[in-house]
């Protein structure tokens, strides 16, 4: 019985921490751009979740620096998919170059950048980790499916920047509603 109550208390605490951390992310300013780094399906999932939350985002799979400069907020979904690379005709080198371009433009134009990783532990392979290493320093805030943070990578890498750990991907809808 003690284990049951301890589990309930721990779950409630994690939920409260997630909500408290969300306050570190400012209200979303429009227009909002949604793009992918790594061409995994996560950005498509994020697009659907944003629609359900009634948060308007322009989804551009291959956004470039010129695109970014037109937006006040940018969500970048990071996760490498070899199938996505093949379908898109890109590779790690071309995605790295695009990443550098969009982050340079975001900094120059003052675009608030939120890194999103909702693929879970399955999207923490070697290539995704390389893309994350490129992207993490440039983000202003992070929204991560908590299973992807089992090793504490995002907690450590985020440092003092806002980090929201979601227990379920569907919790993104509530978070987006809070931020709009």
What would you call each of these model-derived segments?
Residues 22-27, 33, 146-180:
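Charged, low-complexity C-terminal accessory regions
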Residues 50-70:
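A short, well-structured beta->alpha microelement
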Residues 124-156:
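Structural recognition of alpha->loop->beta junctions
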Residues 95-129, 171-180:
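Ser/Thr/Gly-rich flexible loops in soluble cytosolic domains mediating phosphotransfer, phosphorylation
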Residues 1-4:
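Positively charged n-region of N-terminal signal peptides that target proteins for export
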Residues 86-110, 157-164:
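A short, gly/pro- and small-residue-rich
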Residues 7-18:
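Bacterial N-terminal signal peptides
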Residues 27-52:
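Short, charged N-terminal beta->alpha structural module
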């Amino acid at each position: 019985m003690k284990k049951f109550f301890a589990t309930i208390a721990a779950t409630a605490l994690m939920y409260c921490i997630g909500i408290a951390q969300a306050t570190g992310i400012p209200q979303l300013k429009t227009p909002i751009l949604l793009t992918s780094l790594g061409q995994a399906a996560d950005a498509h999932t994020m697009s659907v979740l944003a629609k359900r939350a009634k948060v308007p985002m322009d989804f551009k799979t291959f956004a470039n620096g010129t695109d970014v400069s037109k937006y006040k907020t940018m969500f970048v979904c990071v996760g490498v998919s070899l199938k996505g690379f093949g379908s898109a005709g890109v590779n790690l080198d071309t995605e790295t170059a695009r990443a550098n371009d969009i982050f340079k433009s975001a900094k120059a134009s003052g675009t608030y950048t939120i890194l999103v990783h909702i693929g879970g532990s399955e999207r923490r392979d070697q290539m995704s980790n390389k893309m994350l290493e490129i992207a993490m320093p440039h983000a202003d805030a992070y929204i991560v499916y908590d299973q992807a943070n089992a090793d504490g990578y995002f907690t450590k890498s985020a440092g003092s920047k806002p980090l929201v750990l979601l227990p379920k991907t569907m919790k993104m809808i509530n978070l987006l509603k809070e931020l709009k």
